[in-house]
Amino acid sequence: MPTVVIDAGHGGSDFGATYLGRKEKDDTLNLALAVGNILENSGVNVIYTRTNDIYETPSQKASEANTADADYFISIHRNSSPYDNQYTGIESLVYNRNSTAGNIAQNINRNLESLGFANQGVNERTNLAVLRRTNMPAVLVEVGFINTDRDNIRFDNRFYEIAQAIADGILSSI
């Protein structure tokens, strides 16, 4: 079976986006562990960039994935907008849309859209270390806007379905 690195975005002193006491680093860790558990139960070899509240730079995470010779890299994040409750939905970022990573991202987005999230699409970001410096297909998934109440309610109430949707999007692509 393939090796998938599951990256919980941010961590330690890097809270990521925050909203009314909610920290992106906590949401990403909880979701990364849940997604990884589903993948492990499906026979996938999973490597976590973190399993507790520590910080590593995105470049360190990419380097660790490369050293482990992983087959895929999935980074889990929450989005944020300049104004509270301004935007809603999910988005996946890849280095190149016309790639294996783009296919994985489309599958993940489609699954999350089926749970009621607005699908903001798959977009290219060539400046992100976890997408640029990894030697394997890499996807950064933005699971709802942390400063949008509707997305947080969906994130909390459908947490395990979200984890399953992300895992299924990965499994259907590898």
Regions found by a protein language model. Give the residues of each.
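Active-site-proximal helix/loop segments of hydrolytic enzymes
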Residues: 26-174
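Catalytic-core environment of secreted peptidases
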Residues: 1-19, 74
